[in-house]
Amino acid sequence: MRSHLVKGADRIELTIRSYTDRTGRTPKKKVLLQMHRYIEKDDKWTNKDIPCKSEAEALMKMREVNQYWIAFHGYTVEES
């Protein structure tokens, strides 16, 4: 699932990723909420991975992040 927020040329992309971590003895399902943010004045992308326990938790965090950026920073949801 993805979410795109925009404010002028600045943008935030949120993506929920799930994968199986096979590095240990037993495979474990991992879920991440990935935030990619582009700032025009710096002309660079920043990335942040937020670990979650489940896809439902990742979806709740995605909604919280969306509400924060919309309410406090004036971003709007990009229509696809």
List the model feature ranges, each with a label.
Residues 9-16, 47, 67-80:
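Short, mixed-charge low-complexity intrinsically disordered segments
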